[in-house]
Amino acid sequence: MANSLRSQYRAIKISSLKKAVDKDDAMVGVSNNEYLNLEDGKVMKIRIFPAHPGEEQFYVPRKCYWLSFVNSDGDVKRGTVLDSILHGGTKMDLVNEYVKYAKKKYGKDAEKMEALTGTGLNSNALNPQYSWFCYADEVKEGEELHAKIWEFKKMVRDLLNKLAFSEDDDEPIEVDPFTDVDDGLVLAVKYNKKPNKKKGEQYYEVDFAKKSKQPYSRPLSDDELESFANLKPISEVIPKYGMRDYERALDGLQNWDEENDFNLFDDDEWLDIVEKVKAQYEGNDDDDEEEKP
């Protein structure tokens, strides 16, 4: 049983990983509810788990937007909605369509454009936010690993890919060096909440962890793999976008539109686009099925 299970897990071919990266760059519900969180200023040793059998990648992208929502107390809070194109397989996403239409209507209004797509520190703009999910855990001497969701930013993804895509003279690495059940290398990851740019510090530092100046592996035990096998594949961790997500996005957009005096929801042409976006989810029973026991 154990040997059969081990044989199903494999590291990802670099050629496949590069294709996924190119696809991610083009666009530039967790089963165990546990997340791996980095600690400010601490170098954490991290072991990434492999893709489940049948999965193409050990990580998946997440794309979302921050919007404004009114809670039960009447207070306005910021929250996220997923992107329907990536997470629902649709042709249109409501927030993306809103941004395109707003640019068409207010493109020459610098103040409006700053509110819509500005990148200031306290900006509430509608720029998409990207992150990636994989299964991983912190390596601690003598302790068993338990796969957790590690959500990381593009800078970390790029640093991981830089390590994976490195070449040894004339012989390129053909599989990723992180996820093999026996030979997966341990990472050293440091998060700096307030990096000292003058000293060359970055928000994230990612390298192979080393012993005697050499990268080292941390094999996964049969018990660790059996426990991991019971978790959802990473591609199923982010729920599929449906009608309820659309309704949440519509609510958040209307609040944002009112806060920023864009008044697009008084525009019949924009409301026609809203109806076209909504039609993508009508007749889809996915949301209803999720309610069934």
Predicted regions and their residues:
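OB-fold ssDNA-binding interfaces and closely related basic DNA-contact patches used
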Residues: A2-F178, K240-G283
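Extended serine/threonine-enriched, polar tracts that run as long, contiguous segments within proteins
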Residues: K148-V237
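Intrinsically disordered, low-complexity acidic regions
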Residues: N196-P215, D223-P293
